[in-house]
Amino acid sequence: MSARHKARKAAFDLLYSAEQRGQSLGVALDEFDVRETARLEPLSELQYVRDIVRGVDDNQIAIDEHISAHLKDWTLNRLFAVDRAILRIAVWELLFSEAPKDAVRAEAIALAEEYGSDDASRFIAGVLGAIVRES
């Protein structure tokens, strides 16, 4: 498992659990740092988790607007929390990072296949595909 994959999975866990607990991402990240710093190696992996979570937190309005613009007959609040967390991470990476677009989409689809509902991976692939074509 690549360092970036592990970082994306850790960021997904953090975003999802923070939403489920009604916790701010800043507080969740502080708790994560205390709990996970020794487990994540190399240090660049831990830094990428921080970058993702801070990036999503700082740009959540723009991220959510991009996602919402590509939802057909859905609202962001109606999405499963798992799908919402995966999309927020992927959209942040697509719009605000230097990560390769194909890798971002593939990782998001892999997370959706592992943690999402039956159709989550196709749904997420469609939303991200539309965002990539637009950008």
Model-derived features: positions:
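N-terminal interaction/assembly modules
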Residues: 1-121, 125-135
